[in-house]
């Protein structure tokens, strides 16, 4: 397979995950893949959006919303971008996956590589549990899980605050969302995109 299609469903309230999945999409392209970037449906009523949410929604207005009944068909790999909510995926992403039962029955994602990108307010705000709990859903779909090995030296840095672990890529947003992804975190996101695409090619042989 020369041009694997990598589906990147994401939810981003304040722009952190959007920034990270765009970097992952760049990595997919660098490895010869075709990134398919789509946001999942919002559940928060528009009347409750604050100015920051409105700003991010405007930034993402050209990104299509994924239809759970169609989005998984024909993809060769998947990178899920989801913020942490109490150590789990956000309700918006849960809502998406809970509507994919038809593809679960058909085995659409069996044997396809999958990875997770997340964000949290603090360094110990549930990043790894969110990644792992999201992976449980991906395992039920039959995916082959892809993490970030320590050959990616960016996750070993000690001279700055940074996300990233063997389980997947992450960023730290700050309590009020004031910290955007660092260059170090974006390198990891791009690297994950490359790695997953390369694995998708190998699995299709």
What would you call each of these model-derived segments?
Residues 110-162:
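Short, glycine-/small-residue-rich phosphate/pyrophosphate-handling segment
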Residues 56, 124, 166-167:
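Short alpha-helix boundary/capping motifs
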Residues 1-108, 158, 172-205:
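N-terminal beta1-alpha1-beta2 submodule of the flavodoxin-like/Rossmannoid cofactor-binding fold
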Residues 9-12, 148, 165:
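Intrinsically disordered, low-complexity segments enriched in small/polar residues
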């Amino acid at each position: 397979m020369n041009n694997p299609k990598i589906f990147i469903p994401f939810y981003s309230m304040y722009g952190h995950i959007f920034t990270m999945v765009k970097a992952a999409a760049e990595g997919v392209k660098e490895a010869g893949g075709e990134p398919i970037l789509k946001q999942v449906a919002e559940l928060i009523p528009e009347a409750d959006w604050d100015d920051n949410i409105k700003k991010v929604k405007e930034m993402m207005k050209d990104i299509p919303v994924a239809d759970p009944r169609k989005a998984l068909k024909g993809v060769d790999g998947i990178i899920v971008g989801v913020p942490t909510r109490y150590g789990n995926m956000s309700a918006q992403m849960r809502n998406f996956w809970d509507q994919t039962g038809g593809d679960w029955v058909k085995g659409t994602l069996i044997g396809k590589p999958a990875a997770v990108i997340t964000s949290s307010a603090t360094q110990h705000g549930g990043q790894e549990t969110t990644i792992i709990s999201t992976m449980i859903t991906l395992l039920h779909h039959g995916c082959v899980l892809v993490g970030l090995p320590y050959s990616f030296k960016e996750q070993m840095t000690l001279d700055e605050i940074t996300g990233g672990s063997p389980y997947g890529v992450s960023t730290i947003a700050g309590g009020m969302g004031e910290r955007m992804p660092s260059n170090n975190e974006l390198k990891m996101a791009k690297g994950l995109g490359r790695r997953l695409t390369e694995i998708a090619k190998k699995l299709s042989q």
